Amino acid sequence: AYVGNTPTDTDHQKDVDIVHAPRSTGSVLKPFLYAAMLHEGELLPTQLVPDVPTQIGGYSPQNFSNSFEGAVSADMALAKSLNIPFVWLLKQFTTYRFYDVLQHLQLKNINRHPDHYGLSIILGGAESNLWDLAQAYTNLASETEVFARTQHYRTKEFQHLRYTDTAPLDFGKNTRELPTLRAGAL
């Protein structure tokens, strides 16, 4: 449920809708990169990725802990939200391909050329709003639930979140064709 902006006076900022305001994505895009790479067969959950001091073209990502774990499995890097392994993974996948994934997920505030964001996009170097992020994760969860129950995908699985239930959703036709990004990878 979307609850907010209750009727108050301007002193309480009823006119600020933070749900739709673009904010730094922080680490919330990491699962999308992980899923995209699994989907493309470019990563395995137990594959070791480097968590070591790194400098790529003058960019030196750091982990929140300011420490390094050496070689770490991809699933553990995701679970611990380690920054350096995900910069390495994004470098391998490329910002261009990742940008295309984010566009498929309909993160509309991420709308500049991939070169604008560079590798920092995976660590919060882009902005998105809570509404679009919730929509992306909700659609992926729906895809997983439907496939687990029916063993098929739907051609129009990705839907826009709605404020009201005025009309039924059209999920399109059933298909066995793989989607652009399978949520089951998560």
What is the predicted role of each segment?
Residues 60-63, 94-135:
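Mid-domain, small-residue-enriched loop/turn segments at the edges of structured enzyme/sensor domains
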Residues 1-2, 48-50, 88-89, 101, ...:
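Structural recognition of the beta-strand scaffold that forms the well-ordered cores
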Residues 46, 110-121, 147-154:
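Surface-exposed patches in mature extracellular/periplasmic domains of secreted proteins
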Residues 21-26, 69-70, 74, 78, ...:
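Secondary-structure capping and boundary motifs in well-ordered enzyme cores
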Residues 16, 22-49, 77, 136-141:
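Active-site SXXK
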Residues 43-98, 142, 161-186:
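Conserved catalytic neighborhood of penicillin-recognizing serine enzymes
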Residues 1-19, 29, 129-186:
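A penicillin-recognizing enzyme superfamily signal
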Residues 6-10, 24, 54-56, 83-85, ...:
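Solvent-exposed loop/turn segments at secondary-structure junctions
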